[in-house]
Amino acid sequence: RLGRYAKPFGLYKLRSMSRKYSGQNAIQIFTRMNRPDLVEEYRKHRKVRKDPRITAFGKFLRLTSLDELPQLINVLKGDMSLVGPRPILPDELEFYRGRGSLLHSVKPGMTGLWQVSGRNDLPFEKRVELELYYAQNWSFWLDVKILLKTIPAVFRKGSAH
């Protein structure tokens, strides 16, 4: 993942996806599965609601957001903050249309404006918009507001997948 100043770092996370799909291109996997519906959903959201690559235990981890807890190690190491834009993969940088330097002007966070504004129910373009808004308008009080909204967002049914 890319951190502040686009510096790559290792993101700690509990494995929720079957190992056989690790590091493979999602669109190619869904195409091989003959699932054009998943290809379309992935192109729109960069995620899929009922992802067949996720294990049964992984579904539980994602629904409860427990897969994200190891990122506290990233926070303690200084790679991440509690609040900020989600750390992106290098191939996602193209979606920020030349505004990657703005995105990477702040540390990535465990939670952020995207998570408390609808999370996976929003198209990826909206995520980009929210992440850039945060980077441009960061303030202590915005972080407090996001932190206060995070707990109900985690428990909101269906927002994590």
Locate the predicted segments by residue.
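Conserved small/aromatic sequence motifs within transmembrane helices
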Residues: 1-161
